[in-house]
Amino acid sequence: MKILYLLLAVLLTVLQSSLGFMRVPNNEAQCEQAGGICSKDHCFHLHTRAFGHCQRGVPCCRTVYD
């Protein structure tokens, strides 16, 4: 029974590290792949937020409810 707890702990550790695989987008292709839109100056829609950059100073915006 103790081995079951050990296996569960290892499984949770592996899953926790794999959940953080998504990185912040650094270019336009990565932004669109992550479901975002490149905006000119700021995120224009009320329910969007910046979560990366398409270029220098150009935010990648995505809806909050995704």
UniProtKB/Swiss-Prot annotation:
* Presence of the UniProt keyword Calcium in the record: no
Q: Which domain of life is it from?
A: Eukaryota
Signal peptide location? 1-19
Q: In which tissues is it expressed?
A: Expressed in the liver, kidney, gall bladder, testis, ovary and male and femae reproductive tracts. Expressed in the ovarian stroma and the theca and granulosa layers of the ovarian follicle.
One GO term under biological process is: defense response to bacterium
Residues of the propeptide:
20-25
| Record localization | Secreted; Cytoplasmic granule
Disulphide linkage map: C31-C60, C38-C54, C43-C61
Family annotation (Pfam families): Defensin_beta
Annotated Gene Ontology cellular components are: extracellular space
UniProt entry keywords in alphabetical sequence: Antibiotic, Antimicrobial, Defensin, Disulfide bond, Secreted, Signal
Predominant localisation class: secreted
Specify whether Signal is a keyword of the entry.
Answer: yes
Instruction: Describe the task this protein carries out.
Output: Has bactericidal activity.
Record protein name field: Gallinacin-8
In its UniProt entry, the species of origin is given as Gallus gallus
